[in-house]
Each structure stands twice: as structure tokens, then as C-alpha cells.
Amino acid sequence: MSRVAKAPVVIPAGVEVKLNGQEITIKGGKGELTRVLNDAVVVSQEDNTIVFGPREGVTNAWAQAGTARALVNNMVIGVNEGFTKKLILKGVGYRAAMKGNAVGLTLGFSHPVEHALPEGIKAECPTQTEIVVTGCDKQLVGQVAADLRSYRQPEPYKGKGVRYADEIVRTKEAKKK
């Protein structure tokens, strides 16, 4: 039995929830998110909470209910507060700048890298070596941050590359003669 699924999701003030069968739409100040939930999950709205439970006769229904509850909770937090990922560029000549709806990166390649941002994601560069990715969809914010990091991951000897602000890069010792 899922302990996560047992806890209801509390809907804060200013957040609107619409249930249409297995499709749930959540609207708030930061945007609107829609998700189709698994058929093994029973969803109902009671006052200012969303309650999840398993459908009878389905083997992994509690597990699916816990997953659905976690996803919907992230949707509620996203449309209310939003999610943020901060990236730091470390290395000589490594720079970031906004170019319209794309992030322009200079990462030591023979060409500049431009990463187009998907709809619903905003990015800003407070300094030349920082990128802040924000949005209401937690999965999409994390994916865009991971895509930006993948252009030049931190290398293990000097730690040069694109890293998350809270990431600790373990460095190796150089080879000795």
C-alpha cells in the first residue's frame, strides 16, 4: 500500500482544478498544466483537496496512485510557485547570453551553441557564467537544464564545464611521473 497516495493534495487559494475522467487540468498564477492519469488510479476532488486511490482488481494500482499523486502535487506547486534550476559555467571563455527565445552558449567549441527554449520555459542570464531556468512544469525545467548541461559536462580533472549550482564535482588527481 502506498503511503504517498494516502495523503491528499491540498489545493491552495488561487489554483483551479478541473477533473474530466482521467484528465486533470490545473490552472494557477504561473500557468496551466494538463495530464492524463493512469487508468489504475481513481481520482476525486473533495472541497480543497484531491484524493487518490487504487482501482479494484488492478495489480499495481497503489503504486500508480502514489505516482499520480506525486505528479499532481508537482503540478499544483508548479502553477502556484514555479520551479527553478540554476546552472553555472566554469572555464576560461565559457559564457552564456540570451538570444531571443534561445540561450547562446560559448563553450570552447569552434562554433557558438544555441539552445532553443520550449514553450512554457523561461531562462535568464544574470551574469555571463550563470543560467537560471524557470517554469511551472518540473519535468520540463529539469530536462532543459539537463540539455544545457549536456553540451559540456564538468570534466573530472579541472571541473570545467556546465554544472548545476548545487552539484559537487569530484575532481581526480593528475597523473604523476
UniProtKB/Swiss-Prot annotation:
It comes from Aliivibrio fischeri (strain MJ11). GO terms for cellular component: cytosolic large ribosomal subunit. It holds the Pfam family Ribosomal_L6. GO terms for molecular function: rRNA binding; structural constituent of ribosome. NCBIfam families: L6_bact (TIGR03654). This is Large ribosomal subunit protein uL6. This protein binds to the 23S rRNA, and is important in its secondary structure. It is located near the subunit interface in the base of the L7/L12 stalk, and near the tRNA binding site of the peptidyltransferase center. One of its GO terms (biological process) is cytoplasmic translation. Keywords: Ribonucleoprotein, Ribosomal protein, RNA-binding, rRNA-binding. Belongs to the universal ribosomal protein uL6 family. Part of the 50S ribosomal subunit.
